[in-house]
């Protein structure tokens, strides 16, 4: 009978023979590995691809397979996340840490997917700015804060913001908000819209220009 060592819920054999490889009932993409008739661990099909019944295997080999499987599972978790939308590398790292993934595995996955261009902070920053410009216009200051929170470095943020049309963004925001204070005297209306745009991070010179433009555009035509 081979010696056995157990840790993290897995029992590893110092040396044993693979006696069965069976697909898991609930997840046929994973394989249960049995050594000398006893369950040892479960592996992704791709990780278990080189194993065969009757093969002798050591504890260190099983530990390497277990590590490869952890990396595979973390990678698959990230790929499912990326199917929703792009994410920055820092967002991915935080996401995996929340799922108790080891730091070395996190770095391995990020490096692998960055090399494959599936994680790309430059592309993510451009995507984020374009989405905001299309659906929820923001000032450069607000966009910079959002990208900083997502862990994007300053140089990448600056490049992504270089083409932002802040005047157009402020105009669209002002047009959307203008009706909230319809009927107020001009001075009060201007003050409210000015404060609102300033809170959104737009520079005063742009705010002043846009407030006047939107006020005039909302006045009834004189006959």
Give a label for each model feature.
Residues 10-223:
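An alpha-helical, amphipathic repeat domain used for nucleic-acid recognition
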Residues 1-10:
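N-terminal amphipathic/hydrophobic targeting modules at extreme N-termini
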